Amino acid sequence: MSETSCVNATVAVVGNPTSNKGKGAEVGKQVVELLQEAGRKHGFNVIDVTGESFDDSLANARNRRNEYDYLVAVGGDGMIALGANAVGCSGKPLGIVATGSGNDFARGLELPVNRVETAVDGIVGAIVRGTHIDVDMGLATSLQGGYAVDSSTGDDLVGDSDVPLRPAVNRFYAGMLSCGLDASINDRANHSRLPNGSVRYFVAAIVELTHMKRYGYHIKATLADGTVEERDIISPLLTVANSRHIGGGIEISPYSRFSDGLLDLVWLDHVPNVAECVDAVSHAYSGKILGCKVFGWKRVRDIEITRAQEGDEPPVLMADGEYVGRLPVKVVVQDRALRVLVPPAVAESQAANTEEKVLEAIKRDHRDPVTGKTDTCYAKRSR
């Protein structure tokens, strides 16, 4: 695509002005200025659709979608989720300036993390050259009895007369839907009065890990081969993953690919003992965590998650680090529904991450690619 293709195009910038004690607003302003400078050179216009809050910014990005051709989200995974919910399924490309604490989605795409000028340069280059990739998303919607919560606090929503509201969940996510331990850690950290974000998360993780609960889930999933599996899962951890990373780089779902038309269901088979915890931690950043037998794994096209009769009450659901709602919920993969601006090198790297390479990793970890089970007999057959 020639450089003249972006002449008279409009690039919208959206950020979260309340993030990081107001520093998010400063970074957003910097991104706008950098894009305006590039726009004068390449002939595109820049508008800022940032609102006064996360929800206000999302509403602006949605309601003003006919005013722009590209949307640039500035912030962490939550802001990328905002961008996905603003332009998902529209064909309008999303640019990512990753400046959060986790940045797991950007990390999975090998985009710059906490390097604002480099990220903007990459976005401008992608706009000028027309380079992008189309990635999958998950769509979470409420089943009967499920409902959305306040996206900032996780609290139940109330009306003007303090009457509880029960709006349905209807939300795209780009990275992970967290239904267990990872959600409870985030929730505890968000409600902590400790001053430092890293300290809040560390303390919350220690508390939750040392008081691990056995949450009760009932799942009904359409697997990759089209068969339907229905069962209870009593587990501290249950995650429906579109991307590989969580928690600032932990590869909890190393077999995930952004454009395979599938989601990966990952859970703990049981409350792990000390040795199993050490084994999992030692493989957390190497892409080999699912080689640990304490984990369960399956590829799914869609999944219904409800409350099992046994087990503890699951925590509030979180997607990409933001509050979503309460069970029950249905999740369906949205095949290549989000267009993302990327440099040519990233597009080539993602294209090189083939299904064959993923199957090699699955076999390396002694798992059956169809059933997801760790099987000694299968391991011997695959050698």
What are these regions (language model features)?
Residues 18-19, 101, 181, 244-245, ...:
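Short, glycine/serine-rich, charged loops/turns that create anion-binding
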Residues 178, 182, 237-255, 322-323:
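Glycine-rich phosphate/pyrophosphate-binding beta-alpha loops
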Residues 16, 77, 185, 238, ...:
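A residue-level signal for conserved active-site and pocket-lining positions in enzyme catalytic cores
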Residues 12, 36-40, 45, 49-51, ...:
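Catalytic core of DAGKc-family lipid kinases
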Residues 3-6, 24, 221-232, 251-383:
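ATP/nucleoside-binding phosphotransfer catalytic cores, i.e., glycine-rich phosphate-binding loops
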Residues 17, 74-76, 97-101:
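Glycine-rich beta-strand-to-loop/alpha-helix junction loops that act as flexible
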Residues 25-27, 83-87, 107-109, 251-252:
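Short amphipathic alpha-helical segments
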Residues 1-74, 81, 85, 121, ...:
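ATP/NTP phosphate-donor binding region
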